[in-house]
């Protein structure tokens, strides 16, 4: 049941489970953290009621026991214990959301918000990249609390998203060759607070992204380089490293 298009695998650290999107099977596969070899998933969310069609990425909220799936003009939310042909417990979507092509999502369970990496459509049909920030439990046709978008934002083909709650920061891979970092309080046409990579950097087509705050590290996988790169950025993670040193 595994395939080549699973770009947003996530891990539920509270339950020690690996949660995997399966685009071709229109399914979510949940494996035990200890799974190895040809192992069956412990649960599979799949079927006509799920509304899953072409999922590429997902995100796990371990604190509240939920799975978030960006699916085009909507974000589907499932219970982590769901199994079989089950409907989402919430669906975020509609004209008021401002997006038509959601590709990634991340959850901040501390602030009770989600960040959706998406595009809106301009009057002439162009895609307008954005990071839309919603209440975590938002459902239906609702407006975002804030939207980062515009020329100064430098958003372009957003990949995976990670949130660092302690610092109030959101990290995104930009597949044009860099990682961008904003404050979760940013709104409108604002530039990133920090960037990793760029025109003279090593990154070419970053996809995967993770954070290791204890070691001040931003970890990026690059499709073009076929490599995983680790950047030390203590200026971003000072609060947690200072506390750990006490």
Feature annotation, model-predicted:
Residues 1, 39-47, 86-94, 142-150, ...:
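Beta-propeller fold detector
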Residues 205-246:
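Blade-level signature of beta-propeller repeat domains, shared across WD40, Kelch, NHL, RCC1
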Residues 1-15, 48-64, 96-111, 119-122, ...:
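Beta-rich, blade/repeat-based domains predominating
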Residues 31-38, 77-85, 133-141, 181-190, ...:
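Short loop/turn segments immediately following beta-strands, especially the blade-tip
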